[in-house]
């Protein structure tokens, strides 16, 4: 059966510092690196044909580190489609080498929710300034965005169409897919896969560096139980 693996990136340096991150391109912390490798061990025996990540380095690092322990021994290779000379110069000219790679596609549509004017701000300081209730609304409501940022609803408006139009066709071709992305972009996708209501999705928690695995069969997504 075709597999769909979703994974929130490992702890980032700003997760560690308790700062709102959003689209700021922050790398993994040392703990995040360990989480990504440990998560890789949990999926090391699952077949993977294609990898999708966001355009942010913490998701890309997570995918690469997770694949470093995969039993296939195949090498994840970032594609540079549409990037002019880089696309041409990054070509692989050995069919044997090509067969031992797994394509990695980066997409901004899978980026974390954009937190606007909260980005780079300490979460506790923000609660003191605006009140814990207001910050909770910004973080956990479905349709209320932070100042100049995205709500979860707005995030879903880009992640779900990308998933349906770009990723699902590969699943239907029986390709096993691994997506390394972010808490909110993955929550919005899981909302679709599990048929969650808006009240349910805002309560959904995704731990860093923990895979969520689905079996895909004839347009049906069956979540594997832990």
Curated annotation (Swiss-Prot):
Q: Give the Enzyme Commission number.
A: 5.4.2.11
Cite the annotated pathway: Carbohydrate degradation; glycolysis; pyruvate from D-glyceraldehyde 3-phosphate: step 3/5
Reaction(s) the record says it catalyses = (2R)-2-phosphoglycerate = (2R)-3-phosphoglycerate
Q: Which residues bind substrate?
A: 8-15, 21-22, 58, 112-115, 123, 139-140, 183-184
Q: Which residues form the active site?
A: 9, 112
**GO molecular function annotation:** phosphoglycerate mutase activity
Q: Which Gene3D superfamilies match?
A: Phosphoglycerate mutase-like
Protein family (similarity comment): Belongs to the phosphoglycerate mutase family. BPG-dependent PGAM subfamily.
Question: What is known about what this protein does?
Answer: Catalyzes the interconversion of 2-phosphoglycerate and 3-phosphoglycerate.
Q: What is this protein called?
A: 2,3-bisphosphoglycerate-dependent phosphoglycerate mutase
The record lists the organism as Protochlamydia amoebophila (strain UWE25)
Q: What is the lineage of its organism?
A: Bacteria, Pseudomonadati, Chlamydiota, Chlamydiia, Parachlamydiales
Gene this chain is encoded by: gpmA
